[in-house]
Amino acid sequence: MKEVMAIIRMNMMNKTKRALADAGISSMYAKECLGRGKGTVELPRYMGGVEEQYADMIQELGVFGRLIPKRMIHLILPDNLVKTVVNTVIQVNQTGRSGDGKIFVMPVTESWRVRTGESGDEVLDQ
């Protein structure tokens, strides 16, 4: 069992969610986060091309020390679905430009379903 954590652009969340659903992956957790890599900040790209929001976003980025708003997706999967998820996220989000995102894969050693007390792979929605 693995956890896949993907950090993507905010404006790519719906496309990513649809592509994962089309690939048979429907269970996930997502949240807003702030972060940055080593690249420089190019505001129009990070703002999803919505020119009306430039002033608001510039002000917000200044408050947060130039951290960029992103989406973080967490998926807990059986080992055999990890490559499918990774390939799908890359296919949808890869533009070849700085800020496309990051994907991390981590082992999950134990899991339980609170409602039933089941444990292990049985708790995964497949």
Predicted regions and their residues:
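Positively charged, small/polar-rich N-terminal and surface patches that mediate targeting and assembly
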Residues: 1-126
